[in-house]
């Protein structure tokens, strides 16, 4: 049985085993050879090993220390007190019986060192450094990995402190046995090791109820203090600021940005009583230690004295529990609750009085469970004698301000300077500065001599990470488990349960118990997120990738809202193509207790059924027909008609499905919904950004227009421009783009709940570049008047002719003559597009081509007919490879002509195919989907992209063929999600067929938009990969069947002699991305 996790490479396993067997430290550099940093950290931590971030750029891995810190301290003191080497050797010999000679793990060979020798090395190191000068100690600290391990570091510093206080004088009598107990490493049946046995009694001391609520029992004894990633600059040491470069501010003042709209700083002289500050300083000074990762903001010489009080999000740290109170806060709650609580509440009041807009926004977005002492602050950084170099605070809520207050000290200088504003603020004890911590800031020089000054300050803020999906899901899991455990003994499984009932911080979230058992953790977290926003009188955006159950979340929210508030009306706006889906979902979950007094799905205000429903609705309020709750699900096209028919309609809650349509600059729907004056707004979308960043700005502003006050349009546009520059290939814009990404993401995070990953089988997404046949290329150049390889960018986005031509020359002629125009195309074409074509008559050449095509079909020469189109040739080969495995495929096309042409061609090949068109009624669509799902002989479905890309469950197929590309890549993502969603048990393969025209124009636009989406939503710094850097993937393909298919496609010959396919590209390779969180 392997000793290490599957995520670790074999080389990493060997390295860790070597350290365990020999006790020799290993210096490693994260990368593909060993594994990424998080894998190395997780593996080493899981087995009790110690990790140190030296040398620069690398990590030193050390074996576990099998001795408690208190025992190690006592042993070091005893060792230091002995006079001779003989006495010291005798001391170590007494450890023989109490030290285990081998760890309890399965090793490749026996242990090759005695653990006593490892302890001897540590003890001697500490003893040697007891009398060392600070300079000597620092030199040792820079090169000795053991000094970076918390127990060893603490022991050394404690002994040095006692030596300077004159406490290390007692000698240990010779022959006295040392009573030292060593901790054994516990090995579990699953192969994992727990080097930290739980000490529940110690962990429970002085923990407030709120703290207990924030910490799982299993983590009570695990202290991650010092591993918080707090605004760490990477790379070179940060610069220090000099006061000569700044204008000094000594009196109350407000500093605005150059536009005069955005607050940069508010300085309040003597804002807090000095006695209150000093009392608080005495209680929180202990938070500030050198156990941190902020050396670069302290001149790069040594770690400063700093620490975290309150709640923190350990998102980048090797701990299973990511969001919780810090160790110091839990252990000292009873001590700090008085003076510190009073101080923070006074700061909270000052914040409210001096920056009401920022305060109100921060108060509304902070999760109640993270309100430290019932303030708008979740987290406090405590700094002691810390002159910070230039940095930006990366995790603070961008819609609010950070509060800085000096609590105690005796110093001169050390002004807080804002670099861009050229202002420095003179803060003394009791002074308060509220400022935008995203701006570059730092302290100027201290006038006092080295070591002769003292300054204790706090920085209070709201951590955005506490509102992240990780924290929401983590807490939801604990709450759900507790609820499920409590309800196991309930009398009735049909009862309603309050998901937020186990905490007093959140509004009631009452739903049927059967539904609660069904919801995923993501859905639980989304429900809590929405309920909190609605309670605050705001709206929110649920940006969940396709297949995560947005509809069920929405219905559950509607149920809870009605349950809590009594009779009311709720409006759900959904595209016409999704109305049937809403009806089916409502019917499906009715059996689970999700029952609504009135549920009306409206597609046409002229229908007789609507009149009957409306009559019942209007007759409410009488003695015989009391008021009840109604949920209306309405097609956007009928909103105006509905409102004119139902006078005075005022919904208490509005839900907009596929709500990215709201973000359109000229959205008529937004205007109509605004007229309803409903602030409780929920937008459902898997694609909050489709074309540009401004869509996101408008979307967030629609759910709560107050957020624009903290990030004006001008500032957002500057951020957007920085991101766009980098996305489009300007590497010099990287730093600006990264900052802009972080700022925008943190600014919107309180209002946008984002989950873009789903636990499904793999998705393999390919772009297949198809050639034109000789006939296609000639027609392209003559009829569309553009050379097939040049000047393609001049074509309008609404140009449809190239798409029909890429299907087949005969399809192109049919489009020109109007054969396919009877039902219009299935996209929103620009007005006048078809009028530009006029009445087209076939030329002699056209007529001859049509007759030749007919002749090929009549004579059974299907291969020659297909060879007139690169896409059609590729399609037939792809389908044959799919059907050989008895698997199913869905073909998406946006054009009626292409859909019909594909279906007819497949029928000629005796392939059983069914179709769904835009003109089909809902009943026929449902029958076709059921036939495709249940009939094993039906292997192919041809469907309109605009119809089939939304709401349908096509998981019977695991192959998706995108026949024609379009400028918005999110439409294609929606199409793929019809098959790649919950209930899919197989790997899904997507084939995007692209002609030379699409490769040169549409695919480039798609890559840019995908990169932008990743930047803004996926927390990735992304950039478009130039076309000349995209290599063919055929030789790199790991799957034998697919590699054979790619080779086959390249050998297929078109009319004119060209190969059908020129290149196979992975879609993921068109954008290069790097995670930044």
UniProtKB/Swiss-Prot annotation:
Changing residue 441 to A: Impairs DNA base J biosynthesis. Residues 871-1032 form the Helicase C-terminal domain. Fe cation binds at residues 391, 393, 441. It holds the Pfam family Tet_JBP. Gene3D superfamilies: 3.60.130.30, P-loop containing nucleotide triphosphate hydrolases, Tandem AAA-ATPase domain. ATP binds at residues 544-551. Keywords: ATP-binding, Dioxygenase, DNA-binding, Helicase, Hydrolase, Iron, Metal-binding, Nucleotide-binding, Nucleus, Oxidoreductase. The gene is JBP2. It comes from Trypanosoma brucei brucei (strain 927/4 GUTat10.1). This is Bifunctional helicase and thymine dioxygenase JBP2. It is found in: Nucleus.
């Amino acid at each position: 049985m392997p000793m290490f996790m599957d995520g670790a490479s074999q080389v990493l396993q060997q390295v860790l085993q070597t350290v365990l067997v020999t006790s020799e430290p290993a210096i490693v550099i994260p990368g593909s050879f060993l594994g990424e940093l998080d894998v190395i950290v997780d593996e080493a931590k899981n087995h009790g090993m110690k990790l140190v971030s030296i040398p620069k750029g690398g990590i030193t891995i050390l074996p576990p220390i099998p001795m408690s810190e208190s025992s190690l301290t006592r042993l070091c003191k005893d060792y230091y007190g002995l006079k001779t080497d003989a006495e010291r050797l005798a001391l170590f010999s007494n450890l023989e019986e109490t030290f285990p000679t081998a760890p309890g793990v399965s090793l490749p060979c026996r242990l090759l060192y005695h653990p006593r020798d490892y302890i001897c090395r540590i003890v001697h190191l500490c003893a040697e450094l007891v009398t060392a000068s600070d300079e000597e100690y620092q030199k040792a600290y820079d090169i000795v990995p053991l000094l970076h391990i918390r127990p060893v570091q603490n022991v050394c510093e404690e002994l040095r402190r006692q030596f300077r206080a004159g406490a290390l004088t007692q000698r240990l009598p010779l022959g006295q046995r040392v009573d030292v107990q060593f901790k054994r490493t516990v090995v579990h049946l699953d192969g994992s090791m727990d080097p930290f046995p739980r000490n529940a009694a110690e962990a429970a001391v002085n923990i407030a109820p709120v703290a207990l609520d924030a910490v799982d029992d299993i983590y009570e004894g695990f202290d991650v203090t010092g591993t918080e990633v707090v605004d760490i600059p990477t790379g070179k040491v940060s610069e220090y600021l000099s006061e000569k470069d700044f204008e000094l501010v000594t009196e109350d003042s407000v500093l605005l940005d150059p536009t005069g709209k955005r607050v940069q700083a508010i300085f309040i002289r003597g804002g807090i009583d000095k006695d209150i500050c000093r009392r608080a300083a005495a209680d929180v000074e202990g938070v500030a230690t050198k156990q941190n990762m902020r050396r670069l903001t302290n001149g790069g010489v040594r770690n400063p004295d700093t620490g975290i009080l309150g709640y923190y999000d350990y998102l980048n740290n090797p701990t299973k529990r990511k969001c919780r109170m810090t160790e110091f806060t839990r252990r000292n709650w009873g001590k700090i609750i008085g003076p510190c609580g009073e101080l923070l509440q006074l700061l909270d009041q000052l914040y409210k009085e001096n920056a009401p807009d920022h305060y109100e926004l921060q108060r509304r977005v902070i999760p109640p469970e993270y309100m430290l002492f019932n303030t708008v602050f979740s987290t406090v950084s405590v700094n002691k004698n810390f002159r910070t170099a230039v940095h930006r605070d990366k995790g603070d809520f961008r819609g609010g301000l950070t509060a800085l207050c000096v609590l105690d000290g005796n110093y001169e200088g050390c002004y807080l300077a804002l670099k861009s504003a050229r202002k420095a603020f003179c803060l003394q004890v009791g002074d308060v500065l509220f400022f935008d911590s995203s701006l570059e800031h730092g302290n100027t020089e201290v006038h006092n001599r080295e070591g002769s000054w003292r300054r204790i300050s706090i920085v209070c803020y709201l951590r955005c990470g506490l509102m992240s999906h990780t924290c929401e899901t983590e807490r939801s899991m604990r709450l759900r488990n507790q609820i499920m455990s409590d309800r196991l003994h309930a009398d009735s499984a049909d009862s309603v349960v309050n998901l937020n009932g186990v905490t007093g911080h959140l509004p009631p979230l009452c739903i049927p118990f059967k539904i609660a058992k069904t919801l995923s953790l993501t859905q639980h977290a989304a429900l809590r997120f929405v309920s909190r926003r609605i309670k605050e009188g705001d709206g929110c955006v649920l940006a969940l990738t396709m297949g995560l159950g947005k509809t069920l979340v929405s219905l559950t929210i509607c149920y809870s809202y009605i349950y809590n508030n009594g009779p009311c009306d709720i409006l759900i706006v959904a595209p016409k193509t999704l109305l049937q889906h809403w009806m089916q979902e409502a019917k499906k979950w009715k059996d689970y207790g999700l029952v609504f007094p009135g549920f009306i799905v409206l597609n046409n205000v002229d229908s007789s059924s609507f009149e009957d429903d409306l009559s019942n609705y209007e007759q409410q309020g009488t003695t015989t027909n009391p008021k009840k709750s109604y949920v209306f699900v309405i097609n956007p096209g009928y909103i105006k008609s509905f409102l004119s028919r139902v006078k005075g309609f005022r919904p208490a809650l509005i839900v907009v499905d596929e709500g990215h349509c709201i973000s359109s600059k000229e959205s008529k729907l937004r205007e109509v919904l605004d007229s309803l004056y409903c602030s409780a707004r929920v937008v459902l979308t898997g694609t909050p950004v489709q074309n540009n960043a401004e869509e996101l700005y408008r979307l967030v502003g629609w759910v709560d227009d107050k957020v624009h006050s903290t990030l004006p349009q001008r500032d957002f546009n500057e951020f957007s421009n920085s991101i766009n520059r980098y996305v489009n290939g300007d590497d010099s814009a990287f730093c600006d783009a990264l900052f802009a990404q972080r700022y925008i993401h943190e600014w919107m995070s309180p209002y946008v709940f984002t989950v873009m990953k789903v636990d499904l089988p793999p998705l393999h997404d390919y772009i297949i570049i198809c050639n034109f046949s000789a006939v296609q290329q000639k027609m392209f150049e003559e009829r569309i008047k553009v050379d097939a390889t040049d000047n393609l960018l001049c074509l309008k986005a609404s140009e449809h002719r190239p798409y029909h031509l890429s299907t087949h020359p005969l399809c192109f002629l049919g489009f020109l003559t109007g054969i396919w125009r009877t039902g219009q195309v299935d996209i929103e074409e620009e007005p006048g597009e078809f009028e530009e074509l006029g009445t087209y008559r076939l030329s002699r050449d056209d007529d001859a081509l049509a007759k030749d095509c007919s002749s090929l079909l009549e004579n059974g020469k299907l291969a020659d007919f297909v060879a007139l189109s690169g896409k059609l040739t590729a399609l037939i080969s792809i389908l044959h490879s799919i059907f050989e495995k008895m698997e199913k495929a869905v073909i998406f096309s946006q054009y009626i002509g292409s859909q019909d042409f594909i279906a007819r061609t497949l029928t000629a090949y005796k392939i059983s195919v069914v179709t769904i068109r835009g003109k089909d009624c809902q009943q026929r669509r449902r029958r076709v989907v059921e036939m495709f799902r249940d009939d094993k002989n039906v292997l192919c479905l041809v469907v309109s992209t605009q119809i089939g890309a939304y709401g349908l469950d096509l998981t019977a197929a695991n192959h998706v063929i995108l026949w024609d590309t379009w400028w918005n890549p999110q439409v294609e993502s929606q199409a793929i999600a019809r098959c790649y969603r919950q209930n899919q048990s197989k790997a899904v393969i997507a084939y995007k067929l692209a002609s030379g025209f699409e490769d040169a124009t549409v695919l480039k636009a798609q890559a840019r938009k995908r990169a932008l989406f990743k930047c803004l939503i996926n927390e990735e710094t992304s950039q478009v990969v130039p076309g000349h850097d995209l290599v063919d993937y055929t030789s790199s393909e790991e799957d034998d069947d697919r590699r054979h298919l790619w080779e086959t496609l390249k050998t297929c010959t078109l009319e004119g002699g060209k190969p059908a396919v020129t290149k196979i590209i992975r879609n993921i390779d068109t954008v290069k991305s790097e995670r930044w969180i």
